[in-house]
């Protein structure tokens, strides 16, 4: 096990999400004695990434947050929800990643700052043409649990079966379409957005949690609900 003590933790929100929906998760982890902050994103921070553009603006805010939260260079634990998980994999990397703001590329080398990357409902696969640009870069350059000195923990939710047809209801239809765009198989189990198959990585510690939905704000439990956090917080 890589962890020898409780480390600072940083939460990276999912695509097009700000920090606010993660406030309860951040507070709960702090109450558990895990010093935690969320990358201070707003929805507008994501605008430059639309259409499959590089996620450089998000990586910059992630790097700045880690530097502030662990100024002495101590390795932290990184929680990436949804797209935050594969963006975290880019941050770990030691190969050039395009920087749209300067028309060049940057090596983030975040593996030196991260002890555990814990992804929550992250689609580590995609068939969607815009998302594929970034995810293909990640999977081609850093396949699976790529760095042996980083612990990868991938959490999938299993609550909604993808099915289509007006009799199935909008939740099952939405899940079917999302799963199909993600892994090419709509008739799958997942969290309503990410199918189980796509949320796991080869070589990682892969867990599947029953009854968990993708996003905060639902009447059902999501990855950051207190009873669910209790099932994965030991990896921090």
Region spans (language model):
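Lipid deacylating catalytic domains
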Residues: 2-236
